[in-house]
């Protein structure tokens, strides 16, 4: 029975991802690229940079939460509020980093707003993944699968309406508007995931133990190291190309 349930959940997750994610890539993302042209390259650079900086939001906490909730859900619930507060503190550090970035990197105000917006998007993504780690830990795999595609599903409906149904909607499409629509989709997904996590897990929201933050970071460090190395390896090339093109006066 357990094996049947496992394969059923696995097929459900694979089915959702095979339908929703390719649709978002080929129907929405590709259409936006065609509309904005070369400006999408700038979006890609800042998306990669925001992804690198999003390491601050995770630090291996999601993998740590999945393991902890699978081992002892009651202990994991007690850590919920503490970890969430930790994420807010890391978000403040990230904002400070973005503010300092403006003084060390030659970017325009429009580009600065774009990277800030994409950074907030990564913050919502990281927290949605955090909630999903609890759902996976308590073996609510269908719920985990649903929230893995909810933001893209919302993006398909919202950007799909602008691109294909709204008269002259293509005139509204720009890198800034695309990032803004993504922001709305991630924000809504974050709110729904947060409410669902509170309803299902019923964590102790009033139990915030700041003295547990350092032990949590210490336990999550092995996961964080893997994330840091893989993210830098796969994402830093676009930012380096932009940096050197600015120095050479190409851009």
Regions found by a protein language model. Give the residues of each.
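Interhelical loop/hinge segments that connect adjacent transmembrane helices in multipass membrane
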Residues: 1-6, 171-179, 191-234
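Transmembrane-helix boundary and interhelical linker motifs in polytopic inner-membrane proteins
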Residues: 2-4, 35-39, 53-86, 136-142
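Signature of the first transmembrane helix
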Residues: 4-62, 95, 121, 156, ...
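Alpha-helical transmembrane segments of multi-pass membrane transporters/permeases
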Residues: 10-19, 77, 116-120, 135-161
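Alpha-helical transmembrane segments of multi-pass membrane transport and lipid-handling proteins
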Residues: 18, 22, 57, 81-108, ...
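Helix-loop interface residues and adjacent transmembrane-helix termini in multi-pass membrane transporters
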Residues: 34-37, 108, 137-138, 172, ...
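Alpha-helical transmembrane segments of multi-pass membrane proteins
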Residues: 52, 56, 92, 96, ...
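Hydrophobic alpha-helical transmembrane segments
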Residues: 112, 116-119, 146-201
């Amino acid at each position: 029975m357990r094996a049947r349930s496992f394969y059923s959940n696995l097929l459900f997750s694979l089915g959702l991802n095979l339908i929703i994610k390719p649709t978002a890539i080929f129907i929405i993302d590709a259409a936006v690229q065609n509309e904005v042209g070369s400006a999408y390259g700038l979006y890609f650079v800042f998306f990669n940079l925001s992804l690198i900086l999003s390491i601050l939001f995770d630090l291996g906490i999601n993998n740590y939460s999945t393991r902890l909730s699978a081992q002892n859900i009651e202990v994991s619930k007690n850590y919920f509020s503490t970890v969430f507060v930790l994420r807010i503190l890391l978000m403040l550090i990230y904002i400070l980093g973005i503010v300092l970035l403006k003084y060390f990197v030659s970017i325009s105000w429009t580009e600065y707003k774009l990277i800030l917006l994409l950074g907030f998007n990564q913050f919502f993504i990281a927290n949605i993944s955090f909630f999903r780690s609890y759902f996976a830990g308590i073996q609510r795999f269908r719920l985990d699968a649903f929230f893995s595609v909810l933001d893209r599903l919302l993006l398909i409906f919202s950007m799909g309406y602008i691109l294909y149904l709204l008269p002259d909607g293509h005139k509204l499409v720009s890198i800034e508007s695309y990032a803004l629509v993504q922001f709305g989709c991630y924000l809504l997904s974050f709110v729904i995931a947060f409410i669902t996590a509170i309803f299902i897990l019923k964590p102790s929201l009033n139990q915030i133990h700041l003295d547990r933050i350092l032990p949590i970071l210490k336990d999550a460090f092995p996961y964080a190291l893997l994330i840091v190395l893989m993210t830098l390896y796969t994402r830093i090339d676009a930012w380096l190309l932009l940096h050197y093109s600015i120095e050479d006066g190409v851009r």
